[in-house]
From Swiss-Prot:
Renumbered residue ranges of the record's region Acidic patch: 988-1086
Modification type Phosphothreonine: residues: T916
Residue(s) carrying Phosphoserine: 26, 42, 46, 53, 65, 67, 83, 110, 113, 225, 260, 516, 718, 720, 723, 731, 744, 762, 808, 810, 833, 839, 846, 950, 954, 958, 1012, 1018, 1020, 1156, 1289
Protein name: Claspin
Swiss-Prot/TrEMBL site (Cleavage) positions: D1072, G1073
Effect of T916A: Impairs interaction with CHEK1
Biased composition (Acidic residues): 465-475, 625-674, 989-998, 1008-1017, 1066-1075
UniProt similarity note: Belongs to the claspin family.
Result of changing D1158A: Does not affect cleavage by caspase-7 (CASP7)
Quaternary structure and partners: Interacts (phosphorylation-dependent) with CHEK1; regulates CLSPN function in checkpoint for DNA damage and replication. Interacts with ATR and RAD9A and these interactions are slightly reduced during checkpoint activation. Interacts with BRCA1 and this interaction increases during checkpoint activation. Interacts with TIMELESS; the interaction is required for leading-strand replication. Associates with the MCM2-7 complex and other replisome factors. Interacts (via the acidic patch) with CDC7; the interaction is required for phosphorylation of MCM proteins and CLASPIN by CDC7.
Amino acid sequence: MTGEVGSEVHLEINDPNVISQEEADSPSDSGQGSYETIGPLSEGDSDEEIFVSKKLKNRKVLQDSDSETEDTNASPEKTTYDSAEEENKENLYAGKNTKIKRIYKTVADSDESYMEKSLYQENLEAQVKPCLELSLQSGNSTDFTTDRKSSKKHIHDKEGTAGKAKVKSKRRLEKEERKMEKIRQLKKKETKNQEDDVEQPFNDSGCLLVDKDLFETGLEDENNSPLEDEESLESIRAAVKNKVKKHKKKEPSLESGVHSFEEGSELSKGTTRKERKAARLSKEALKQLHSETQRLIRESALNLPYHMPENKTIHDFFKRKPRPTCHGNAMALLKSSKYQSSHHKEIIDTANTTEMNSDHHSKGSEQTTGAENEVETNALPVVSKETQIITGSDESCRKDLVKNEELEIQEKQKQSDIRPSPGDSSVLQQESNFLGNNHSEECQVGGLVAFEPHALEGEGPQNPEETDEKVEEPEQQNKSSAVGPPEKVRRFTLDRLKQLGVDVSIKPRLGADEDSFVILEPETNRELEALKQRFWKHANPAAKPRAGQTVNVNVIVKDMGTDGKEELKADVVPVTLAPKKLDGASHTKPGEKLQVLKAKLQEAMKLRRFEERQKRQALFKLDNEDGFEEEEEEEEEMTDESEEDGEEKVEKEEKEEELEEEEEKEEEEEEEGNQETAEFLLSSEEIETKDEKEMDKENNDGSSEIGKAVGFLSVPKSLSSDSTLLLFKDSSSKMGYFPTEEKSETDENSGKQPSKLDEDDSCSLLTKESSHNSSFELIGSTIPSYQPCNRQTGRGTSFFPTAGGFRSPSPGLFRASLVSSASKSSGKLSEPSLPIEDSQDLYNASPEPKTLFLGAGDFQFCLEDDTQSQLLDADGFLNVRNHRNQYQALKPRLPLASMDENAMDANMDELLDLCTGKFTSQAEKHLPRKSDKKENMEELLNLCSGKFTSQDASTPASSELNKQEKESSMGDPMEEALALCSGSFPTDKEEEDEEEEFGDFRLVSNDNEFDSDEDEHSDSGNDLALEDHEDDDEEELLKRSEKLKRQMRLRKYLEDEAEVSGSDVGSEDEYDGEEIDEYEEDVIDEVLPSDEELQSQIKKIHMKTMLDDDKRQLRLYQERYLADGDLHSDGPGRMRKFRWKNIDDASQMDLFHRDSDDDQTEEQLDESEARWRKERIEREQWLRDMAQQGKITAEEEEEIGEDSQFMILAKKVTAKALQKNASRPMVIQESKSLLRNPFEAIRPGSAQQVKTGSLLNQPKAVLQKLAALSDHNPSAPRNSRNFVFHTLSPVKAEAAKESSKSQVKKRGPSFMTSPSPKHLKTDDSTSGLTRSIFKYLES
């Protein structure tokens, strides 16, 4: 590029001298050019070109010898000037061709006008110094790493030359040139080597920055600029003349490419070079301004904080500021060499200012001013002006650059101190190539500058020494930098910074200063904030959690006196209040409170179970001494079977347990109240024995999951859980499928196992219980084969495990059945040998504290029926035997089906019958149904409410449930069927109320619900239950069988309906029944949308209904008060004709003849209008009369809605029954009132309205009914606005007309005698809906 530029400039400039210069320069520039090789340069230019290339490749140039350095130092004068000239030419050509031409003209004139040669030579001397300096800078920068001594020699030579320049005498200049020629001769040898080593590799670098046309770096301009400042333009002109001469001589040598520099032309070349350098300096003066301005622009761009030359890593950003060391890649070296000139200028300025005498410093200013003046005296004053401007601007630019560079050097030093590694410096070189290269060049030039000033000033090496010392100090500081040249660079930089007054002691740091960021927010006063916090703590002291307290509570206890009478005694019970923790403090996690509650419950249950087991074991030992051996064997068989079954189902249960555990967690969170407690009790019982707990948890989870999935089938999915479910009536009741007998057996078994007596003890207990209850004895002997409850689980945790399993399925499922089973099992806690004691106790706890869950005292009583009866009396509970009897009657139907669903074999049904109390006759005899119901109801209440409270609490609940069961025992089958079919498991009160309301259709209590579930599962189970009832009470069995038959029929019907409606699907969840009631809101919250959404929906619905009501009212008012034609006048084209067409035959318009559509404009219209008014009056009157009745019935229907088919069915049944009783008188009265009203309406329509009150006075509900009734099509939508689309078959409409006419005619005579509708309202609440009034409307 430079060569091309030179040629182009040559074309522009016709002066042969200039051409020769250009030609000579073009190769030299080519040294910097990317495409030309610097290889064989002419003698004169070869040195300069070499040094130019060396400048660019300062860092990589290796000095072969001191002589080479000398040559390098000698030639750099010319080299600097030549390169600067060429650079200026190129830059000016690229940006300022006119200036280049002027410069060349000036050079030519300087050649021609030899008179100015003296001035030029003087200026040359002045600028030979800068040239020497630049050459030394370039040469030393090149050879700096290799030899400082050689640089010193060059400096001394240059010092002599500089002194001559100061004198501004030609003689000195010539001597200087001679010396330089000598140096060049020595250098020439090195130059050749360097040309081979440096020039071509430099060209190979292909750096575009070398191309000055493309990149006007102004680096070399800057190198010369300080010299220019130091030396006037006169020297530049002299140098231009010499260089022009030089180029003339050089042209052939350059063209030939032969280096004849050694051959003696060096002297003349020196002069020529001086001239060239002077001319080049004059060009550089112009070029510097441009290049430095561009450099300033580049620097500003580089230094801009937001300028990011390339994507860098965070490490690069950290390393950004440090200046590159002399080592670097080709690009970095090229840039550094280019930017070196500016740094050289700055360094020379600083070094001269500090090290040079004031003479030299003033001399630089004189040079600058003189250069400006001499430029003015040039043949081309324009060029001189430009140079003046350039030099002045260059100085200013240099000052700015010096400042910027100094700042950058400081930062670089800081960062270099931080990161002394050369790798970092290289990275920094890449990042801040310009700054880094400048500094490296500064460093390289540093020594040169330090020497040059003192050479120029003749100060001797003291200044260089000082400079060296100064450099050494920064070197020590910058020892971290890996390479010597960088150290020197840093030395010089630090030296310069010190000279500039910069505090070098400041250590760099990665963190930004406080002032580096603009913080708009006011500074926070930390002390004040801390004070506020302390004050807040004092003002609002954290409420300390209340420690656990023991409070004595006065309790009235029923106690048995020594004489056997019950007495109420005052007792003091110590109650330990749980430590009260702050809500926010202790419970930070979502489920933490629940977990803590669970843990506490488990601990409490462990203690309670342990105590109860001990009591039970003692009771078992006392009561079941004889029976333990037999029952132990039976229990072993049962446990084996249960284990086998459990093992088979353990895997399934484990999977199900995982799901159930999640469900349980959700349920527990929902039920966090009582249900959580109950679940925790169950879980705690499960946990009592770790092994048992684990098994129980698995079993319970599996069983509960299975129960949910299978409808609470108590399949022994896990050894303990299945066995507990089947063996323990409580578990079966929880599952909701065990018959009462089966439940009692399971309860006995559960009692045996929970007691955790040895198998002998548990067996003996079973045998004893069975002896007390023959059914249980049979169970012990025959059923043990199927009692999958694991003894391990049963003894320690089986009962609770099952309870835990069951609780998770859905506590409501176990309401009635669980209560009944629990009560039975509790009644027969003598069964403790069964492993399900925990589940048994959980569900039977309320009926009998003796059950496993009951307190220790309760458990003691549960051991045997006899002991239980006594204990129950002492505790105030009914005998467990009675509970069992009640339960056994209820349960027989459920167990079979449940067992079948539980994957029981066909033989298992028999086993279930036996286990469930097909031997229930004895159990039932022992346990009156009343106690059963009480206990079961209590248990159910507890379970349903989600309260798995202490066994004591569960016991009263079960007893209450037993009472309820007894009360509802008559309607149990129907209630169960209804409840199951409808999917609603109402409370016992609801059941009783429904029983009263619906008679046979009673909603079964939860126990009965489970029984009904069992019945649903298998009719055979019901039959077995019936058989058991026969054993217990044949009368009761007969009653039950009848009820069961009805129930089964009803159940089949309801089941079919449920299957169709899908209500059966939710039955399992609905088994939760009463428990669901407790946390029903939570469940609803899960299903329903948010309150806002609900509110918005309700508002929409309300507004819609209001709008419909308004529309209905408006239509009624229109019909009443507006003429027939005006009714739809609001819509254009919406004539009565249209209305008549689209209305059904049974609609209001049907009152008018269908033909009225065609004849509306004719006479029929009048007739129809009259008839319409008449009918409307009659209809309104009748509606007023029937508004209340219709309203009531409609509201009932609406209330029933589509929620449950069972409710609809029950309503229908009751409605039919009521209609049978009251339909005739109601019909008569209605007809009378209707007939009366129409006639009255016809004659005095307005008077009639006044009598009955206007529609405005009617309540909104009545108006709605009226609007609905006004639509005669019963199948049509209620909204009158849709009447247009009602369709009735014309035949039906006609038939309806005829029938209505005939009926009206028949009953016409009785109009006057009918009582007023007001009195008739109360008579009929249902028939009004079923009967159509419109048959009376047409006469």
